[in-house]
Amino acid sequence: MADFLTLSPEVNSARMYAGGGPGSLSAAAAAWDELAAELWLAAASFESVCSGLADRWWQGPSSRMMAAQAARHTGWLAAAATQAEGAASQAQTMALAYEAAFAATVHPALVAANRALVAWLAGSNVFGQNTPAIAAAEAIYEQMWAQDVVAMLNYHAVASAVGARLRPWQQLLHELPRRLGGEHSDSTNTELANPSSTTTRITVPGASPVHAATLLPFIGRLLAARYAELNTAIGTNWFPGTTPEVVSYPATIGVLSGSLGAVDANQSIAIGQQMLHNEILAATASGQPVTVAGLSMGSMVIDRELAYLAIDPNAPPSSALTFVELAGPERGLAQTYLPVGTTIPIAGYTVGNAPESQYNTSVVYSQYDIWADPPDRPWNLLAGANALMGAAYFHDLTAYAAPQQGIEIAAVTSSLGGTTTTYMIPSPTLPLLLPLKQIGVPDWIVGGLNNVLKPLVDAGYSQYAPTAGPYFSHGNLVW
């Protein structure tokens, strides 16, 4: 995987565009789905015939023995059908990951055109007149490099996660009798669908920096590497001892991501929700509990998936899944200042509602992070400036939050039975003052300033100063 960081866009783009495409993966997914349907039908038919025989025509000890063996065979068929569904889901996940990576990869023709332009400019740069144009072209090339690196890293992460879960079909069938209580199975075999007892942690990343590299082109590759590292860390301390599997979706917000060709927020979230759903189905097929952690924009993907699972008759049981949303901007900034259903055209984003869910969910935010904990009295400019600094210091770091760091703010049980518990990671020192600490200003001075400024900042939040005047909630001014 590491070679993606050092390979030029000429290589990474050529690799992606030279591939065979997702057609074979989609065909495999369809074939596995068809096999699963046939196995489920066979199981139902066999069970119906045996039940009818035992209920009407065949009674006694031999009938009961037959029924026990028939139930084992029916269970074998059902378990095999579940495995076939899991294989279909994995193939579809890979197809979606390829499509996302392909869309995010720079076309080789654009890379070649950029290199040709630089060569021409350099060749005619007799008096240095082309130096600014060369620098601009090189900056674009650095962006291409960063864009390809992120695309390939995310694609590799999904492929690695899928590959880790795949096992030989013959081995799975051999282990089915033991799973179903058979007597002639090898007790040393591993579990059917999970070779490790480690719980899976599906991570859903926040917005990608792939296009933002135009702002800082020469560190684009470092941004890509930092983003990939952060994505595997999301929820690592909230669910310790779990194995991360990253959902590789576009994670862009239209032109605000730094490119006219970037996918808008609604499309990114929709793609992410579909990919997350496939990951959940594949992971829960093992019978092991699964955790899901989303950071920032990833928390919005989780909310869309929770809403879908709430109406899905085939959703996994409530005991199979646990969610955590970290530094979510929708439950924070968006739902503070905008009514649900409001669309922001420049981002292609429509504000969603917090869904009812059958699953237990933790909502975690860092105090004074403007994305997840904005001041609901925006006319308090000091609170606003402090919250901007809070985002810079705390937003991404919320990915590493642990339960013992949080203060429980609220716990609400929905009509579907799931409890949503909100936690705040407190910041004793105002983010506005953290730069002073970093440059070595004595603690007693910083502490004194904190004591003076904190009440003024907290007046910008109705939760800290409920009697300090009106405030915004869901886009409405509350008096």
From Swiss-Prot:
Domain PE-PPE residues, every copy: 240-462
What's one GO BP annotation on this UniProt entry? response to host immune response
Question: What is the protein's given name?
Answer: Uncharacterized PPE family protein PPE63
Q: Which gene encodes it?
A: PPE63
Example of a GO cellular component annotation carried by this entry = plasma membrane
Q: Which InterPro entries does the record match to this protein?
A: AB_hydrolase_fold, PE-PPE_C, PPE_dom, PPE_sf
| Organism in which the protein naturally occurs | Mycobacterium tuberculosis (strain ATCC 25618 / H37Rv)
What protein family does this chain belong to? Belongs to the mycobacterial PPE family.
Q: Where is the composition biased (Polar residues)?
A: 187-202
Task: Enumerate the residue ranges of region (Disordered).
Answer: 180-203
